[in-house]
Swiss-Prot record:
It comes from Persephonella marina (strain DSM 14350 / EX-H1). Monomer. This is Enolase-phosphatase E1. It comes from the Bacteria. It is an enzyme of class 3 (hydrolase).
C-alpha cells in the first residue's frame, strides 16, 4: 500500500528546459559577481573551501569561478555548485525576475494528493534551499505547503539505491510503501532496487517513452489514479 510519494522536480513536475534554458544561464551570468560580493559570508567561505577540496588544490578566486562555470557547462551535480546556485536563484525569485513553471497535470495531482492527506516529499539534485525557492514562487503560487519534506544530494546520489533507503528511514516508512516519480530511468532503477514502487514520467519533451523498460511509464500525472 502506498503511504507516501517521493517526487523529482526537473522533467517530472517542471520542464527540463526551465533549468537548462533559464536557471543555469541565470546563475552562470551572476556567479562571479555574487561570489565577489559575498566573500565575507561564512557560508560562502565554506563553499569555496569545499570547491578547493574537491579540486584537490588551492585555487585563486578566478579559478574558483571558472571551476563553477565548468561544472555548470558539464551539468555536474556537485553540492557546492548547487548551494551557490541556490543563493543566486533566491535573489532572482525574491526579486520576481524568476518564476517557476509547473506542469498543469502535476499541479492538479499534487493538489489532489494534498487534499487526500497523502504525504509528499521532494528528492532533487538541486539543494533543499533551491527546491523550497522553486516551490514558493511557482505560476500557481506558493506550493511548499504541499510537501512534508525535501531531500537533496546531501542524502546521496540519486542513482544509488542506498539514497532511497535513507529517505525511507528518514520518513519512517518501509521502501515498499513509497511511490517514487521521476523522468530519469537510472533513478527509477535505483529506487526500485531499494524496494520502492516506481513510475517513470515519460513526457515527450523531457524524457521520451523507453521501449522494453521494466517499470511503469506515464506521460502525465493524470494517468496515476491508483492512490
Amino acid at each position: 500500500m502506498i503511504k507516501a510519494v517521493l517526487i523529482d522536480i526537473e522533467g517530472t513536475v517542471s520542464p527540463i528546459s526551465f533549468v537548462k534554458e533559464v536557471l543555469f544561464p541565470y546563475s552562470k551570468e551572476r556567479i562571479e559577481e555574487f561570489i565577489k560580493k559575498n566573500l565575507d559570508n561564512p557560508d560562502i567561505k565554506r563553499i569555496i573551501q569545499d570547491i578547493k577540496n574537491i579540486e584537490g588544490r588551492d585555487l585563486t578566486l578566478e579559478e574558483v569561478v571558472n571551476t563553477l562555470i565548468r561544472w555548470i557547462d558539464q551539468d555536474k551535480k556537485i553540492t557546492p555548485l548547487k548551494e551557490i546556485q541556490g543563493y543566486i536563484w533566491e535573489e532572482g525569485f525574491r526579486s520576481g525576475r524568476l518564476k517557476a513553471p509547473v506542469y498543469e497535470d502535476a499541479y492538479r495531482k499534487l493538489k489532489e494528493w494534498k487534499e487526500k492527506n497523502i504525504p509528499m516529499y521532494i528528492y532533487s539534485s538541486g539543494s533543499v534551499k533551491a527546491q523550497k525557492l522553486f516551490f514558493s514562487h511557482t505560476e500557481y503560487g506558493d506550493l511548499t505547503g504541499f510537501f512534508s519534506g525535501f531531500f537533496d544530494t546531501k542524502t546521496g546520489n540519486k542513482k544509488d539505491p542506498q539514497s532511497y533507503l535513507k529517505i525511507a528511514e528518514a520518513v519512517g516508512l518501509k521502501p515498499e510503501n513509497i511511490l517514487f516519480l521521476s523522468d530519469n530511468p537510472d533513478e527509477i532503477r535505483a529506487a526500485a532496487e531499494a524496494g520502492m514502487k516506481v513510475i517513470k514520467i515519460s513526457r515527450p519533451e523531457d524524457s521520451p517513452y523507453i521501449d522494453n523498460f521494466p517499470y511503469r511509464q506515464v506521460d502525465s500525472f493524470d494517468q496515476i489514479t491508483d492512490l
